[in-house]
Each structure stands twice: as C-alpha cells, then as structure tokens.
Amino acid sequence: MKKFIITIILGLLISSSVLARSTGCKEGNCDNGYGKWVYTDKTTYEWEWVKTKKHGKGIETWPNGYIYTGEFKNSVWSGQGILAFPDGSTYDGEWANGFMNGQGTFTWADGKKKSGIWKNGKLQE
C-alpha cells in the first residue's frame, strides 16, 4: 500500500507540472492575489497566488477525482493539507516538498486508519 500511495503522489506531482499543461488564468488575479487557473487537461487551481506561483491556501482539483485542499509554497504542497482520492480515501496532515511529511492520518475508503509520522510519503513505523 505504501508503494501505491507514493506512486500516486509522484504521478500527481509529475502531471501537475505548470509548464507542461498551462492554459491560463480564468478568474481573478493569478499573479498576486486570488484567482483560478485552468490547465489544458482541465485540472484547476483556485485561491492564493504570489508572483505567479501557487502560494498560501488553495484547492487543486484533477479531472480524475483527486482533490488537494491545503497550503502551497512556491507551487508545491507544503504545510497542512488534505488529499482526497477518487476511491474515497484521504490523507490529512502535514506536507513538505510535495510529499506527506510530518504528522498525518491516512484513511482508507472503508474507514481503516493509519496515523503517525510520515517522511517523504512513507509512514515511519
């Protein structure tokens, strides 16, 4: 399961490359302020922007059902956040450099939970 989670997160990070999928700002101010950016694959990012980067709080939504709601730093998931998976599973906790890093809880769709300290996407047991 750990490899599955890491694979999904790495896939999301790779697929979220701004340069590979940029379309444009569709609402608000995506330079410095609050705005909505839509990518060519229909992935969206809404909320805070600083110097054209996702920075502060935001919501990133993929057409395949993944939704990240939380903090960004220089367009990377960093701080507190929740990643919701299409199957209903979630990770709620700390992020750094785009990975689960710090205290967090992974909850499977069936309600089973694993909590603890995560490092680079892996639960430290």
Q: Model regions: which residues?
A:
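Glycine/tyrosine- and acidic-biased, solvent-exposed loop/turn segments at the edges of beta-strands
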Residues: 15-125
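Bacterial N-terminal signal peptides
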Residues: 7-15
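Positively charged n-region of N-terminal signal peptides that target proteins for export
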Residues: 1-4
